[in-house]
Design a protein with these regions (language model features):
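Short, low-complexity disordered leader/linker segments with a strong preference
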Residues: 1-32, 427-443
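Beta-alpha junction/loop-to-helix N-cap segments that form part of ligand/metal-binding clefts
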Residues: 24, 30-32, 45-52, 63-140, ...
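Glycine- and acidic-residue-enriched helix-capping/strand-helix junction motifs
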Residues: 42-52, 187-192
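Venus flytrap/periplasmic-binding-protein-like
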Residues: 80, 127-129, 135-138, 215, ...
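Extracellular/periplasmic Venus flytrap/periplasmic-binding protein
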Residues: 86, 135-136, 144-254, 291-298
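Periplasmic-binding protein-like
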Residues: 94-108, 126-130, 178-183, 230-240, ...
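Extracellular/periplasmic periplasmic-binding protein-like sensory domains
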Residues: 143, 250-330, 410-413, 424
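Segments of small-molecule ligand-sensing domains
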Residues: 309-323, 334-408
Length: 443
């Protein structure tokens, strides 16, 4: 009896001293996906939605399908607060996570992407920078491990200028107009400036760059400058708390909100609802729409939320623009891993192997329909040379309660964007001593 008591006590002590298997801790036949989220700070409202949707999709695949061809997805969150100081340690902490290292990183922070870009290539860990990150990384010949998928900042800016041209009665009507680019003064906000100025020269409109110091809650001086300039249009590249502050400032300046065009990080419910009436008639681009009518969103609600398994504590945000963007991120992550399994086998894969899956990803209308995501995402075809794979956006307008889509897919100026991407990537390659891949030889 004494031996039994001692044995039980020893077993209990060992159990208590052993670390509990937390969500994301890998075991055999598991695929690890890092989640470098930001749930605190001035960008938390966006981060909780995007990463909540991302986690929900991975959990959905595990619960409904048992993983990807039998390989369970695991993950671990690491709080970046949308800062490089925290983002870099998160990268270093998670990149070598067992059993096979990080599948890919989706930081949703341009500054962090810039900070880890070189080391990710060395470490052979893909960076999936859906609608963010370094634009010239769209040239996969120079940046084999970076994927600015769906659309990049330069493509989107040409979409916005094209939309303004359509609203003005034709691209020739842009000549003589005044257009402001109001942007958060960080790497992300500055990214469109080069092509914005290029398009000003092409179409003859007068440009003005107006930076907003982060986090962007005080814009009094910026809107005084805008009023003095008297622009026909204001393009906004904002994020987080800057966006509702921008809409309120525009209202105080009596500037018509239907002539304020935000980018796809300036067009969510988290931006418009806090601004109240000041947001009515405001327009933004979108890469994915809001809504819960999509089959995939309805399936997630049934499989996860009806059973208390969802990640979002505020269920009213399910189906928001940014939540759905997280679902889109999950779809791309899972389908890239699935594609890579087709080549390397149904087993846990390395970052180098998932990179191949990303570069050979082909989401056509048929596959999107099978995923229940028709209307949620646009077709995506990635190649060795083209790591963007899409480029089109739609536009939406806030009616005071919800977003209404007001355009079809608008295609970017692909020649202009590609010429600039290749020139910038070539300069980077020369500076770093990189020999671009020959895609005719299979990358």
């Amino acid at each position: 009896m004494q031996h039994l008591i001692q044995g039980t006590a020893l077993a209990l002590a060992l159990a208590l001293s052993a670390p509990a298997r937390a969500q994301g801790t890998p075991v055999a036949n598991e695929q690890f996906v890092p989640v470098p989220s930001y749930r605190v700070g001035p960008y938390a409202a966006a981060g909780t939605s995007v990463f909540g949707g991302f986690i929900d999709y991975m959990n959905f695949i595990n619960v409904r399908d048992g993983g990807i061809n039998g390989v369970k997805l695991t993950w671990e969150e690491c709080e970046t607060s949308y800062t490089v100081d925290k983002g870099l340690p998160c990268y270093e902490k998670l990149k070598g996570h067992p059993p096979t290292g990080a599948s890919m990183f989706s930081f949703y922070s341009t500054a962090i992407v810039y900070a880890v870009l070189d080391r990710a290539g060395t470490d052979k860990v893909p960076l999936v920078t859906i609608v963010h990150g370094r634009t010239d990384a769209s040239d996969g010949r120079v940046f084999p491990y970076v994927f600015p998928l769906m659309t990049n900042y330069w493509s989107q800016n040409t979409d916005i200028v094209k939309f303004i041209g359509m609203r003005s009665g034709g691209m020739d009507k842009l000549k003589g107009q005044k257009i402001v680019h109001l942007y958060l003064d960080v790497a992300y906000g500055k990214e469109p400036n080069e092509i914005f100025l290029k398009q000003a020269a092409m179409y003859g409109f007068e440009p003005k760059l107006v930076p907003v110091p982060p986090p962007g809650t005080d814009q009094q001086s910026q809107w005084l400058e805008i009023r003095q300039f008297a622009p026909d249009w204001v393009i906004v590249t904002g994020y987080g708390v800057m966006n509702p502050a921008m809409l309120k400032a525009a209202a105080r300046a009596n500037y018509p909100r239907d002539h304020v065009i935000g980018n796809f990080w300036t067009g969510s419910e988290e931006d418009t609802i806090p601004a109240g009436d000041a947001a009515v008639n405001y327009i933004s681009s979108l890469i994915n729409p809001a809504g819960t009518d999509f089959k995939i969103i309805q399936d997630i609600q049934k499989v996860l939320y009806d059973k208390g398994l969802g990640n979002m504590t505020d269920k009213s945000r399910i189906g928001s623009v940014l939540y759905n963007r997280g679902i889109m991120t999950g779809i791309i992550t899972v389908e890239a891993i699935r594609t890579a399994q087709g080549k390397y086998g149904k087993k846990p894969l390395t970052g180098e192997q998932t990179r191949w899956g990303l570069e050979n990803l082909n989401l056509d209308d048929k596959r999107i329909a099978q995923l229940g995501a028709t209307g949620l995402i646009q077709p995506l075809k990635v190649t060795c040379a083209d790591h963007e794979g899409g480029g089109a956006v739609k536009f939406q307008q806030w009616d005071g309660k919800k977003w209404k889509i007001i355009s079809d897919w608008i295609q970017p100026d692909r020649k202009l964007v590609r010429d600039m991407v290749q020139a910038s990537a070539a300069k980077y390659a020369a500076e770093k001593g990189i020999t671009p891949r020959d895609c005719s030889k299979g990358g």
